[in-house]
Protein backbone atom coordinates (compact mmCIF):
# COMPACT_ATOMS: atom_id res chain seq x y z
CA UNK A 1 0.00 0.00 0.00
CA UNK A 2 1.41 3.40 -1.00
CA UNK A 3 1.63 6.20 1.53
CA UNK A 4 -0.23 9.42 0.85
CA UNK A 5 1.57 12.75 0.80
CA UNK A 6 -0.22 13.69 4.02
CA UNK A 7 1.09 10.56 5.78
CA UNK A 8 4.63 11.28 4.59
CA UNK A 9 4.43 14.90 5.79
CA UNK A 10 3.14 13.79 9.20
CA UNK A 11 5.98 11.25 9.52
CA UNK A 12 8.58 13.91 8.62
CA UNK A 13 7.04 16.40 11.06
CA UNK A 14 7.61 13.97 13.94
CA UNK A 15 11.35 13.56 13.25
CA UNK A 16 14.12 15.43 15.07
CA UNK A 17 16.49 17.74 13.21
CA UNK A 18 19.26 15.13 13.37
CA UNK A 19 16.95 12.48 11.91
CA UNK A 20 15.96 14.89 9.12
CA UNK A 21 19.62 15.55 8.27
CA UNK A 22 20.18 11.79 8.04
CA UNK A 23 17.05 11.44 5.88
CA UNK A 24 18.25 14.16 3.50
CA UNK A 25 21.66 12.48 3.26
CA UNK A 26 19.95 9.19 2.43
CA UNK A 27 17.91 10.92 -0.31
CA UNK A 28 21.07 12.47 -1.75
CA UNK A 29 22.79 9.08 -1.83
CA UNK A 30 19.87 7.07 -3.18
CA UNK A 31 18.91 9.50 -5.95
CA UNK A 32 22.43 10.90 -6.60
CA UNK A 33 21.35 14.52 -6.05
CA UNK A 34 22.49 17.41 -3.90
CA UNK A 35 20.36 19.54 -1.58
CA UNK A 36 22.62 22.57 -2.19
CA UNK A 37 20.93 25.74 -3.38
CA UNK A 38 21.10 26.47 -7.09
CA UNK A 39 23.31 29.46 -7.91
CA UNK A 40 21.51 32.33 -9.62
CA UNK A 41 23.17 33.95 -12.63
CA UNK A 42 24.64 37.37 -11.92
CA UNK A 43 23.20 40.37 -13.77
CA UNK A 44 25.24 41.55 -16.74
CA UNK A 45 26.42 45.05 -17.62
CA UNK A 46 26.92 47.72 -14.95
CA UNK A 47 26.88 45.28 -12.05
CA UNK A 48 29.89 43.44 -13.50
CA UNK A 49 31.91 46.65 -13.62
CA UNK A 50 30.99 47.43 -10.01
CA UNK A 51 32.03 43.93 -8.93
CA UNK A 52 35.47 44.41 -10.52
CA UNK A 53 36.02 47.58 -8.48
CA UNK A 54 35.06 45.95 -5.19
CA UNK A 55 38.09 45.59 -2.93
CA UNK A 56 36.48 44.23 0.23
CA UNK A 57 34.34 41.12 0.41
CA UNK A 58 32.18 39.34 2.95
CA UNK A 59 32.58 35.57 3.19
CA UNK A 60 29.15 34.01 3.71
CA UNK A 61 28.52 30.39 4.69
CA UNK A 62 25.30 29.48 2.88
CA UNK A 63 25.17 25.77 3.77
CA UNK A 64 27.29 23.35 5.76
CA UNK A 65 26.57 20.40 3.48
CA UNK A 66 26.81 16.77 4.57
CA UNK A 67 30.04 16.99 6.60
CA UNK A 68 29.13 19.45 9.35
CA UNK A 69 31.99 18.42 11.67
CA UNK A 70 34.66 19.19 9.06
CA UNK A 71 33.00 22.54 8.31
CA UNK A 72 32.93 23.43 12.03
CA UNK A 73 36.66 22.62 12.27
CA UNK A 74 37.39 24.79 9.23
CA UNK A 75 35.31 27.67 10.65
CA UNK A 76 37.13 27.42 13.99
CA UNK A 77 40.49 27.51 12.22
CA UNK A 78 39.52 30.49 10.06
CA UNK A 79 37.81 32.59 12.73
CA UNK A 80 39.46 31.56 15.99
CA UNK A 81 36.06 30.91 17.58
CA UNK A 82 35.46 28.31 20.27
CA UNK A 83 33.73 25.03 19.50
CA UNK A 84 30.25 26.11 20.63
CA UNK A 85 30.41 29.46 18.84
CA UNK A 86 31.64 27.84 15.62
CA UNK A 87 28.95 25.14 15.84
CA UNK A 88 26.21 27.76 16.39
CA UNK A 89 27.54 29.81 13.47
CA UNK A 90 27.60 26.81 11.12
CA UNK A 91 24.15 25.57 12.17
CA UNK A 92 22.74 29.08 11.72
CA UNK A 93 23.72 29.16 8.02
CA UNK A 94 23.42 31.33 6.02
CA UNK A 95 25.81 33.45 8.10
CA UNK A 96 28.60 35.92 7.33
CA UNK A 97 31.86 34.43 8.60
CA UNK A 98 34.21 37.33 7.85
CA UNK A 99 33.55 40.87 6.71
CA UNK A 100 35.76 43.26 4.77
CA UNK A 101 38.39 40.76 3.62
CA UNK A 102 40.49 41.04 0.48
CA UNK A 103 39.56 39.01 -2.58
CA UNK A 104 42.63 36.77 -2.08
CA UNK A 105 41.82 36.05 1.55
CA UNK A 106 38.14 35.52 0.72
CA UNK A 107 38.93 33.07 -2.09
CA UNK A 108 41.37 31.17 0.15
CA UNK A 109 38.80 30.87 2.95
CA UNK A 110 36.11 29.88 0.44
CA UNK A 111 38.37 27.13 -0.93
CA UNK A 112 39.11 25.72 2.55
CA UNK A 113 35.44 25.66 3.52
CA UNK A 114 34.34 24.12 0.22
CA UNK A 115 36.97 21.40 0.64
CA UNK A 116 35.35 20.66 4.01
CA UNK A 117 31.96 20.33 2.26
CA UNK A 118 30.40 23.76 2.81
CA UNK A 119 28.72 26.04 0.30
CA UNK A 120 30.27 29.53 0.48
CA UNK A 121 29.71 32.80 -1.38
CA UNK A 122 31.75 36.00 -1.56
CA UNK A 123 29.71 39.20 -1.50
Curated annotation (Swiss-Prot):
GO terms for molecular function: mRNA binding; structural constituent of ribosome. Keywords: Ribonucleoprotein, Ribosomal protein. GO terms for biological process: translation. InterPro entries: Ribosomal_bL12, Ribosomal_bL12_C, Ribosomal_bL12_C/ClpS-like, Ribosomal_bL12_oligo, Ribosomal_bL12_oligo_N_sf. It comes from the Bacteria. Belongs to the bacterial ribosomal protein bL12 family. Forms part of the ribosomal stalk which helps the ribosome interact with GTP-bound translation factors. Is thus essential for accurate translation. Homodimer. Part of the ribosomal stalk of the 50S ribosomal subunit. Forms a multimeric L10(L12)X complex, where L10 forms an elongated spine to which 2 to 4 L12 dimers bind in a sequential fashion. Binds GTP-bound translation factors. This is Large ribosomal subunit protein bL12. It comes from Acinetobacter baumannii (strain ATCC 17978 / DSM 105126 / CIP 53.77 / LMG 1025 / NCDC KC755 / 5377). The lineage of its organism: Bacteria, Pseudomonadati, Pseudomonadota, Gammaproteobacteria, Moraxellales.
